[in-house]
């Protein structure tokens, strides 16, 4: 079975899709009945088309931040989806290849903080800071923000500014991405109280791993130099995936094909699965996709890795006859100087994994340094839908009732460690 997308072509093998044809309408109805409904955490379905209306505002905010601070570097202070979605989107769009525009900080230990400062040559006034947190109280993000805020103020005091002037000058380096409601977000209150540049939002009912088209990612892409037209192409392609993913026609619904592929393995007692991405553009995609998978499909662990590297750390286990697994491979269209060897490598992987179980191979359209904008939008939105469809297919095929809010969009178990951090952040200053 093949996919129909112009930016992405996938060949599936080893799954009998005819077994699922009678349930296609049921699968889609379960999804569409929840999509874009308040409290269902599926507001990301139509987010791309809503974000098309905000492109001009986002680019204007980028320009204003650079102008008011006088610097053209950005540090992203965020963790989880607030970090991995941005890293993924920058990389697949061929931006920020050398960290020339955007840095990231998401740690809480002293060595990591010192290493981050060294990337700025300890000149922290040379960067702007985007603080991304829905609540504004995320431990790791809050720790980094409070330290940097104090250092900025002290640096301006050292320049001879008064306390009030130093605080105002430091504030010119910050922009918040958080809940629009100040009653819900400490960070929004901080932004308002300190007259930070605004407004960037984390939309309601959009979980971090599903937020690749939310403000924090689009702002970062614009900051790194993505053209407006390319952003529009990317968002339009993502919305087209959303539209087709709610079609009760398996010939059109590529996301459902993928969801069935992964569900079929579990329904047949195969819990191990592997998804590999070929090439350096996917170095960060594997972290984002691993988060998407392991926070959504909680009863199994999927290995998401980059090749060729994975063939030198996991092949022994993958090809051990005692292990049963299903396999997916995402590869870029290659018409360059390495294309012959790349094609041979892909053929070798496909042939090798074909004997381990069901497989699909995904071929994505490329530009010089990454994917085309259309391909970037397509593959990113496709992953979100396929992840949720896996849960739906498994439940429907086993005659199990699905919860009102899909388990794949929630993350209740993360509170297991967060509850042990309830003492707050021990750092200079405060939020709220």
Can you say where each PLM-predicted feature lies in the sequence?
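Phosphate-moiety recognition in structured ligand-binding domains
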Residues: 1-432
